[in-house]
Amino acid sequence: MLRICSGVDRVDRDCLILPWIDVKAPPEAPAFIIVPSAGVKYVEMALGWFFKLFFFVSTPFDVVIDFLFRVVFICLELDGRFLRFSSSLSDSDWLDCWLSAVSVSSRYDSEIVVGWVSSTNVLWVVFRSFICFMEPNSVRTSAIKSSPLFVNHFTKSVAWSKLNGVV
């Protein structure tokens, strides 16, 4: 089972850092990113509101994005689970950590894992966009945005999950 930790100030090898969210991985596993199924529901709702606003209301794009992420992360925070990314990881380590939740998901709590895997496309959009907007001028962010490795690893991990009956 995953051990949940919140309010962690120091960065451990198995704890990732992102504002508002943190999850502690089991000691035998690499760093994990898992969004609980309840959190996924809120993400999907927020994305629905985003598309309605973007396509039907004449609102500046940056205002819509700001609203979207406020809603998404307030809802995830209300769910009581937190997730953190580590800015100290190299890009390749960061990508491996990000995807490890999918690639070894059959070992852990099925409700949490299925909530993550069945909504990978939604979460992919949310987290990728969030990172890009969080540090728009960052060299690291630009590298992640345009990295074929990011897309390839993501696609292979989802395919692995489907092949192994996780989805």
From Swiss-Prot:
Name of protein: Putative non-structural protein
Organism: Bombyx mori densovirus (BmDNV)
Upper taxonomic lineage: Viruses, Monodnaviria, Shotokuvirae, Cossaviricota, Quintoviricetes
